[in-house]
């Protein structure tokens, strides 16, 4: 049986890894061991933050809705309760966008929520 040497595969794997580490500072983009650790950490951060991004945006939407609702004399929790009772099915993303881009429409929604409470 022929002897298998791994030179070609190792070079291919290292090249792929260093390609992923492109743009990193210093030895993080040049040395294979350091680059591997850095890429692994970067991929873990990306995985974690894809999940955190959902939380962060929801938090941002709630802050924006709360601020806009308080400008109309209503707290966030009372506003959301009023929407639920009025049967208005708008999600937080749409409400936050409406509060920023179309304040007139948002004020009409607040009035409907106020009547339902």
From Swiss-Prot:
- Fetch the Pfam families from UniProt: Ribosomal_L20
Q: Name one GO cellular component term.
A: ribosome
Write down the superkingdom of origin.
Bacteria
GO molecular function terms attached to this record: rRNA binding; structural constituent of ribosome
Keywords from the named record: Ribonucleoprotein, Ribosomal protein, RNA-binding, rRNA-binding
InterPro entries recorded for this chain? Ribosomal_bL20 (IPR005813), RIBOSOMAL_L20_CS (IPR049946), Ribosomal_protein_bL20_C (IPR035566)
**What biological-process terms (Gene Ontology) are attached?**
ribosomal large subunit assembly; translation
According to its UniProt entry, the function of this protein is described as: Binds directly to 23S ribosomal RNA and is necessary for the in vitro assembly process of the 50S ribosomal subunit. It is not involved in the protein synthesizing functions of that subunit.
**Family named by the database record:** Belongs to the bacterial ribosomal protein bL20 family.
By what name is this protein known? Large ribosomal subunit protein bL20
Species per Swiss-Prot/TrEMBL record: Roseiflexus sp. (strain RS-1)
